[in-house]
């Protein structure tokens, strides 16, 4: 799998391209700006770009209106297809944000329910009770994601919903030639849905990468042969953040040894987790590419802006074993000197 030895560059398109925070309905091809960065991203050593939400939404991107259309604030499907083509020409894979747990109140099927209530053919696409009311006085109650009622939870046990999502993924492959998906709040997704998604993506006949957003807990529940290829390793991200900002080097040592140490009992031997390394502000135009930055070795965890990020995939395999051992040795020495242990 190509992703197992990749460095990912994350772009939050709405912020990166300077789009309005609220969808104003105007079609502006701002997404084409990303093509200007392709050479710079490649020279950083990144060979994949992960795009945060790109599709039509009410505001921040995670409140989707339509999975089939690029957000008008960013341009059209043709504009984004041109960007993907440029990235591929520079040897950069494209991964999109799959926000399948919830949609926005402006989602086309939810608007049909608002209008037709019981008579809507899409009422079972969501978790709805018509004997209640919502915070927005819709005349029915619905489940929002973790109490955020601007984000309407999809019913992923409904075959029609699953089929719609799969049809959209196939469309993305055909129009944009994407190479994978990052699943938003994967810890909330029905595991049967994840299995179906993996089977569908495997059937596409390509090395299609699936990585899930997981915070804490047992990553093995979601990563495996019939599940996701990888997940976000927030445990190590927290350790990296603490090591650089609080000089707490014990935490990252503990996390690395717990996850990928030499003992047989370590949690994720043989698995590949996506580690968040750095967050940066993005200038209006690409910086000079004369001296490539060492993105692979950057361990800076400052919290600035979600315009762009860098990730590396780590695994308990030969290619990464040396770097893991080196990191833990360094952390042990520094922790010992600082008296933290």
Question: What positions do the PLM features span?
Answer:
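Aromatic- and acidic-residue-enriched segments that line the glycan-binding/catalytic groove
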Residues: 26-27, 60-72, 100-140, 199, ...
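Active-site-proximal helices and loops of the catalytic beta/alpha 8
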Residues: 114, 174, 184-267, 292, ...
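Conserved, mostly hydrophobic/aromatic
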Residues: 11, 41, 51, 67, ...
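N-terminal structural segment of carbohydrate-active enzymes
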Residues: 1-93, 101-103, 108-112, 147-148, ...
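Loop/helix patches that line or flank the sugar-binding groove of alpha-linked glycan CAZymes
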Residues: 2-5, 26, 255-259, 264-341
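Core domains of carbohydrate- and sulfate-ester-processing enzymes
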Residues: 90, 108-151, 239-262
């Amino acid at each position: 799998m190509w992703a197992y030895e990749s460095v990912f560059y994350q772009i939050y398109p709405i912020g990166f391209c300077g789009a309005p925070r609220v969808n104003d309905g105007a079609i502006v091809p701002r997404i084409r700006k990303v093509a200007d960065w392709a050479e710079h991203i490649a020279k950083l050593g990144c060979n994949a770009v992960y795009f945060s939400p790109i599709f039509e939404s009410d505001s921040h991107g995670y409140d989707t209106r339509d999975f089939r259309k690029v957000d008008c604030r960013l341009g059209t499907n043709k504009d984004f297809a041109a960007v993907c083509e440029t990235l591929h020409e520079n040897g950069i894979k494209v991964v999109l944000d799959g926000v399948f747990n919830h949609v926005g109140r402006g989602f086309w099927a939810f608007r049909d329910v608002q209008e037709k209530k019981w008579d809507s053919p899409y009422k079972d696409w969501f978790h709805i009770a018509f004997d209640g009311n919502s915070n927005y006085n819709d005349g029915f109650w619905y489940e929002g994601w973790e109490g955020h009622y601007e984000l309407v939870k999809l019913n992923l046990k409904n075959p029609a919903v699953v089929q719609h999502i799969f049809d959209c993924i196939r469309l993305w492959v055909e129009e944009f030639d994407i190479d994978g998906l990052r699943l938003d709040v994967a810890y909330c997704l029905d595991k049967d849905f994840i299995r179906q998604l993996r089977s569908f993506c495997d059937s596409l006949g390509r090395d299609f990468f699936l990585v899930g957003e997981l915070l804490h807990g047992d990553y093995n529940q979601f990563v495996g042969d019939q599940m996701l290829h990888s997940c976000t390793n927030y445990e190590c991200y927290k350790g990296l953040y603490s090591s650089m900002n609080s000089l707490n080097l014990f935490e990252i040592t503990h996390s690395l040894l717990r996850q990928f140490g030499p003992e047989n009992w370590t949690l994720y031997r043989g698995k590949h987790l996506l580690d968040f390394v750095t967050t940066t502000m993005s200038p209006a135009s690409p910086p000079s590419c004369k001296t490539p930055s060492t993105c692979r070795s950057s361990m800076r965890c400052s919290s600035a802006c979600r315009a762009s990020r860098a990730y590396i995939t780590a695994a308990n395999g030969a290619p990464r074993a040396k770097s893991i051992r080196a990191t833990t040795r360094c952390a042990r020495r520094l922790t010992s000197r600082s008296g933290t242990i």
